[in-house]
């Protein structure tokens, strides 16, 4: 994925002012920045939910800016928004089946998901509103894994989680990277530094720094 100098507006407000970043295939890249810096808007711009007015977004060699969100998703880009987007009245299994794409291999992907999140296998009949906050977050991530996505955009997966659940989520994201490329938004620097190979810092709607996470960690010591 290559994001090149995108400018995104929400109404009359100029939210992103020339954001650029690259997400190498098969690795985890993290976007860092304070609240309100433009990280979530960057994800939504990639997905076509808040389309940029200027700049390019290239995925698998194809320019995707200007395409409808549905068509972008069908190219193999999955999204895990913050705030645990699940169907709370539906069971775990129903939530997963609703995320299936036509001609997908649900059973194979379900096996992968249940190996990744054993709690979901144990609770597969329970409705989403009976799950804990951490289990709901796991289900939100799992829903994005039902299709065979090439790129997964994950927004603040550790938000509101207890330390033991953060550790479980970290292990799950590590395993995910063996299957798909990940662009992660994360405020927890310790988690981000242990997961990501590359980073981009967003500040006030601009990408101000990027590079190898290893170098950023060494600079902050």
Language model segments and positions:
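Conserved ABC transporter NBD signature motif
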Residues: 55-64, 75, 108-110, 115
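A short, proline-enriched helix->beta-strand linker immediately N-terminal to the Walker B motif
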Residues: 145-150, 179
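Conserved ABC ATPase signature
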Residues: 127-131, 135
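Conserved structural motif at the start of ABC-family nucleotide-binding domains
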Residues: 1-3, 16
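The feature captures the beta-strand-to-loop junction immediately N-terminal to the Walker
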Residues: 32-34
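Helical segment within the ABC ATPase nucleotide-binding domain
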Residues: 166-179
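Helix-to-loop junction immediately C-terminal to a conserved catalytic motif
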Residues: 47
């Amino acid at each position: 994925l290559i994001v090149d100098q995108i400018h995104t507006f929400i109404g009359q407000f100029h939210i992103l002012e020339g954001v650029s970043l690259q997400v190498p295939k098969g690795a985890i890249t993290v976007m860092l920045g304070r609240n309100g810096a433009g990280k979530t808007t960057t994800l939504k711009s990639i997905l076509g939910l808040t389309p940029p007015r200027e700049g390019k977004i290239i995925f698998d060699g194809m320019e995707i800016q200007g395409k409808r969100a549905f068509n972008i998703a069908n190219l193999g880009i999955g999204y895990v928004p913050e705030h645990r987007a699940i169907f709370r009245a539906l069971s775990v299994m129903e939530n997963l089946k609703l995320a299936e794409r036509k001609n997908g291999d649900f059973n194979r992907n379900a096996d992968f998901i249940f190996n990744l999140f054993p709690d979901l296998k144990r609770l597969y009949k329970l409705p989403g509103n009976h799950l804990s906050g951490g289990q709901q977050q796991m289900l939100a991530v799992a829903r994005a894994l039902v299709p065979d996505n090439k790129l997964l955009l994950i927004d603040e997966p550790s938000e509101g989680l207890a330390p033991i659940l953060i550790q479980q989520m970290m292990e799950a994201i590590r395993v995910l990277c063996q299957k798909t490329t990940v662009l992660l938004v994360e405020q927890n620097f310790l988690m981000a530094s242990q997961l990501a190979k590359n980073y981009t810092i967003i500040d006030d709607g601009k990408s101000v720094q990027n590079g190898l996470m290893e170098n950023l960690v060494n600079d902050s010591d």
